[in-house]
């Protein structure tokens, strides 16, 4: 893992380099796309980006949890949560990238 975090500015820079829009237009495009995704999620709509992922808001019912230190039962309030489900295409890409990094990290076996 590289540990790098990709920011809005990184996305805008990538659009600038690959698409050819100006830096300002690239930043506006990234902001517009993110705003549209956020607005749809807030409205309770499912956002499905083919070959990438699905974002969805889910209602969780009230339930009983347990304090791990004391063992005491604690009610957990009902709430809405957002879920992110990676597509099979993305999952496959991640697995291939992981396998490739793992193979590169493995030292070559010297011939005996």
Swiss-Prot record:
PROSITE patterns: HISTONE_LIKE. GO terms for molecular function: DNA binding; structural constituent of chromatin. One of its GO terms (biological process) is regulation of translation. It comes from the Bacteria. GO terms for cellular component: cytosol. The keyword Cell inner membrane does not apply. InterPro entries: Hist_DNA-bd, Histone-like_DNA-bd_CS, IHF-like_DNA-bd_dom_sf, IHF_alpha. Keywords: DNA recombination, DNA-binding, Transcription, Transcription regulation, Translation regulation. CDD domains: IHF_A. Pfam families: Bac_DNA_binding (PF00216). Belongs to the bacterial histone-like protein family. This protein is one of the two subunits of integration host factor, a specific DNA-binding protein that functions in genetic recombination as well as in transcriptional and translational control. HAMAP family: IHF_alpha (MF_00380). NCBIfam families: himA (TIGR00987), PRK00285.1 (NF001401). Heterodimer of an alpha and a beta chain. This is Integration host factor subunit alpha. It comes from Rhizobium rhizogenes (strain K84 / ATCC BAA-868) (Agrobacterium radiobacter). The lineage of its organism: Bacteria, Pseudomonadati, Pseudomonadota, Alphaproteobacteria, Hyphomicrobiales. The gene is ihfA.
């Amino acid at each position: 893992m590289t540990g790098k975090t990709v920011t809005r500015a990184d996305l805008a820079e990538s659009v600038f380099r690959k698409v050819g829009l100006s830096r300002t237009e690239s930043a506006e495009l990234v902001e517009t796309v993110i705003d549209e995704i956020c607005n749809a999620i807030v409205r309770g709509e499912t956002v499905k980006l083919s070959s990438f992922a699905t974002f969805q808001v889910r209602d969780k019912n009230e339930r009983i949890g347990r304090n791990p230190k004391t063992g005491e039962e604690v009610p957990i309030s009902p709430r809405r949560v957002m879920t992110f489900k990676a597509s099979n295409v993305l999952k496959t890409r991640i697995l291939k990238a992981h396998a490739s990094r793992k193979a590169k990290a493995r030292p070559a076996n010297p011939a005996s």
